[in-house]
Amino acid sequence: MNIIDELKWRGALNQATDEEGLRELTEEKKIALYCGTDPSGDSLHIGHLIPFMMLKRFQLAGHKPVILIGGGTGAIGDPSGRKTERDLETRSKLEQNVQSLTKQMIRLFGTENFTIVNNYDWLSKFTMIDFLRDYGKLFNLNTMLNKEVVASRLDAGISFTEFTYQILQAIDFLHLYRHNDVQLQIGGSDQWGNITSGIDLIHKVEGSDTKVFGVTIPLMLKADGTKFGKTAGGAVWLDPEKTSPYEFYQFWLNQDDRDVVKYLKYFTFLSQEEIAGLEEKVQTEPWKREAQRRLAQEVTTFVHGQAATDQAEKISAILFSGNIQDLTTAEVEQAFAGTPSVEVSAEPANIVDWLVDTKIEPSKRQAREDVKNGAIRVNGEKVTDLEATLDPTAKFDGKYVVIRRGKKNYTLAKVHA
C-alpha cells in the first residue's frame, strides 16, 4: 500500500496541496519531509505524537524525516490556533528546552535516517535589511491578511512579531528544500496557511514547477467533542518525570470504546487485520477492554520502551488485586503520583490519631467507625484494631505510607525525618 493510501486509511490525512502529485512522488523515490515544533516547553506531550506518528510512518517506509526545532521561531511565537499572544521565553530557557526535546525525539526516531535541525542556526544570521530585501518583498500583504491564522486575530489584535511568523516558517521550508532536499511539510490543521506560504515562496524563488508539497492532519477530537490530549490533570507528557509511564499507560487504557479503534489506527503500527480483530472485540466483548489494553501497550512501548510497559502492567495488576505490599518503592512513586498526598513525620502513632492528624479522616468518630468496619488499609493490609500503632517507616524504604479508605480512595503519605 502506498504511504499516502495508508495515511488515508488511518484517518491521518486532512488536506493536501496535491495529493496525486505526492502519491506519484513517493512511488518514484524516497523523499525527505519535515515537521516543525517550537521549544515552548521542556517536554513533548501526546499532542506532539499526532504529527510525529505520521513522520514515523514515513520513516518506516524508507523516507527520511526531519524535525525542525524552532529555536528561532520559538523566540517569536506561533499565533496559529491561539486567541492571545504567547509569553516569550528567554534565550537560555529556549536553549534548555531545545536540548530536552532533542533527547526525546531521538528516543522516538533513533539516529538512522533521521535528522534534527534548529532554525535558529539560519534565522539568527539575517539582518533586518536582509529579511526585508530578500523575503519581505516576496509576500503580498493582502494574502497574508487573509490567512486564517491572521484573519482570526485581527479584531482582537495581533502584533507585527506574530504577523511575520508565517514568513519565517516559509523561509524554513525554503532552507530545508535547498539544504536537506525536503519536499514535503506536514503539520496540524491550523498550519495550513503557514505551509502554503512556504510552498508559494519556494515556487517564487526556485520556479513554479518545483515539486514541493504540504499536508495537514485532522484535528483529533474525542467522541464527546472535546479535544484529544487533555485530562482533568492537564497535559499528558512524554517525559517520564512529568507523567510516569504508569500514568501514561493508564491514559490510553481508559479511552472510550467509541474512540479506541480510531486511536489504534492512528497511534499504533498494527496492521489492518489486527485492528479489525480488535474492533470486533470492542463490539462483541467490550467489557474485556482488549482494544484499550493493546492500545496502551503499543503506545507506551513506543514512547517509553517494553520494560516500562511491563512495569506499568505489573503496577496495574497489583493495584487491582489490592496487594500494595508487592510494589517496590519506585513503583509506589509511579502508581500514586497523581493521588492526593500528605507530609507526615516518621514517628509512630495511634492509627485513629494518625488518620485525623493527616486529615485523611475528618474526625475521630469517623476514623474509629472506618477502622472498626474494615474500611482502612495501610500499605495493603486491613487495620481493624483501634489501638493499633502505625509506623510510617515500616514499608517502602521508610519513605511512604499508602492508605486506602473504602474501595478506591487512596492517599500517599510522604515520610520526612
UniProtKB/Swiss-Prot annotation:
EC top class named in words: ligase
Annotated S-S bridges: none
InterPro entries in the cross-refs: aa-tRNA-synth_I_CS, aa-tRNA-synth_Ic, Rossmann-like_a/b/a_fold, S4_RNA-bd, S4_RNA-bd_sf, SYY-like_C, Tyr-tRNA-ligase, Tyr-tRNA-ligase_bac-type
Recorded catalytic activity of this chain's protein: tRNA(Tyr) + L-tyrosine + ATP = L-tyrosyl-tRNA(Tyr) + AMP + diphosphate + H(+)
Ranges of residues in domain S4 RNA-binding: 349-415
Gene Ontology MF, one: RNA binding
Pfam families the UniProt entry points to: SYY_C-terminal (PF22421), tRNA-synt_1b (PF00579)
UniProt KW keywords: Aminoacyl-tRNA synthetase, ATP-binding, Cytoplasm, Ligase, Nucleotide-binding, Protein biosynthesis, RNA-binding
BP terms from Gene Ontology: tyrosyl-tRNA aminoacylation
Cellular component annotations (GO), alphabetically ordered: cytosol
Motif ('HIGH' region): 39-48
Binding of ATP, residues: 230
Listed EC numbers: 6.1.1.1
Subcellular location: Cytoplasm
Binding site for L-tyrosine: 34, 165, 169
CDD domains: S4, TyrRS_core
Quaternary organization: Homodimer.
Role summary: Catalyzes the attachment of tyrosine to tRNA(Tyr) in a two-step reaction: tyrosine is first activated by ATP to form Tyr-AMP and then transferred to the acceptor end of tRNA(Tyr).
NCBIfam families: tyrS (TIGR00234)
Family note: Belongs to the class-I aminoacyl-tRNA synthetase family. TyrS type 1 subfamily.
Name of the protein described by the UniProt record: Tyrosine--tRNA ligase
Organism: Limosilactobacillus fermentum (strain NBRC 3956 / LMG 18251) (Lactobacillus fermentum)
